[in-house]
Structure formats: structure tokens, C-alpha cells
Amino acid sequence: MDHRLLEIIACPVCHGKLIFDKENSELICKIDHLAYPVRDNIPVLLENEARELSLEEEK
């Protein structure tokens, strides 16, 4: 994922910063505890596409 893109996109729920999880190909919002999928190098920033992070994943 392009680091320049990460600088301009934000969580659609809280507008907070997103962190790219390369291993799982997801964008993580630590504030809302949500993971947004990245498909074919395109972030899917739809709340209904996000999954909630488990307690173990948040560490």
C-alpha cells in the first residue's frame, strides 16, 4: 500500500488514522477497533465491510 495514500485516508467512522496490516491486508482503526479489507490494493472503507478486532488482535 502506498504510504502517501495512508497519509490522506481516514477511518470513515471516527475520521482517525488507519494503520496498514500487510500480513492480513487490512487497514486498522485502533480507536474503533475495526479492520477494513484491502482488495487488489484498493482499500474498502465501508463500515459494513469492516470487521471488529478481537482482544488478541488489538495487542
From Swiss-Prot:
Pfam families the record matches: Trm112p
GO cellular component terms, semicolon-separated: cytosol
InterPro entries: Trm112-like
Sequence similarity: Belongs to the UPF0434 family.
HAMAP family linked to this entry: UPF0434
Protein name, as recorded: UPF0434 protein PMI0721
Higher taxonomy: Bacteria, Pseudomonadati, Pseudomonadota, Gammaproteobacteria, Enterobacterales
